[in-house]
Amino acid sequence: MKENEKRALELKIKLDDIFKQYDERTKYILSHPELIEKVNYRKKSDNSLVDKNGIKKPICKDGILLRGKCEYKGDHWTRNSNGHEIVDYLNSLFRVLVATKDSNEEAEETLDTTNLGVEWDIKTETLRSNKSEEICINRTFAKNYISIICIFMLYQSHSENEILEVLADIDKCWSIWNNAPIARINLKKQPGNGSINDSRLSSYISLYGEILQKQIELINPTVIINSAGKPGMNFFKKIYKDLECIDKNYGNGRDKWIYIDKIKKLVIIDIYHFSYRGWGLNDQSLFKELIHRLIYTSMDINKLLM
């Protein structure tokens, strides 16, 4: 076995063990009512960690995305492994981790989601609509997620106009995302209920934070794209103590998007949530803003990571 394959196998075993730790943590939380209260809905009788029958909800699996064949299983899209995703991720120029605050599918209370792999395991996501066997990417979350990955993958080798031309063609965008060796984690750690407020997300992070940190350290990204808002950024600032903003003097100086940790050799891009409709404005102003900020800071990023 080659050295990089050995490293990949060791990493897979450790990442698989992480989800056993998540399950054990959930069992512990469920046995302590004062902890359950932290993530409850507004109604005292509700418990967001169990379903209406009192059965513990599964932890949302996530990590390095699968890059094998996409398949439609009759009522949902899923994805197989090509057998070398972890090797490709470890060998990639930039190890990109996308941090989101919710899964990309929202389940109805009455829907049997047992087989919805994309619901429970983000690694199998295709970003195609589960409502049709047609290859259809029509959700705001998916389009913006794909587009932002494309911007990061292209900004060093393409002009602004060339990137905007790619962004105008969702099929080209999907093709780039489809082959990109990237990882995604869901900071909420529970699937379904596709939106969550900041205070509740912060509660989830406080309950699962120690294991989340272990998972992130194993994935060992060089770039984190934070789409989990303030709770996500606060969490990363606790993990990475030496973060400094490198675009604070860009434009009006009010917004801060790009941070680096010189000790950890890490870049964090703190952007709007992928479901924010402002990303889809006709003038593509927010996409342009991200491109400009990446170009503005490219010397610092290259010096850190190249």
Where are these regions (language model features)?
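C-terminal capping/extension of enzyme domains
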Residues: K2-D17, D198-Q213, M233-M306
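Short acidic, S/G/P-rich loop/turn micro-motifs used as interaction or catalytic elements
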Residues: E105-E106, P191, P231-G232, S275-G278
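Glycine-rich anion-binding loop/nest that anchors nucleotide
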Residues: T100, T222-P231
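Hydrophobic beta-strand segments of well-ordered beta-sheets in folded domains
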Residues: V96, T222-I224, V267
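Residue-level marker of positions within ordered structural domains that often coincide
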Residues: N104, I149, G229, K262, ...
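A polyanion-binding, active-site-adjacent surface
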Residues: K2-I219
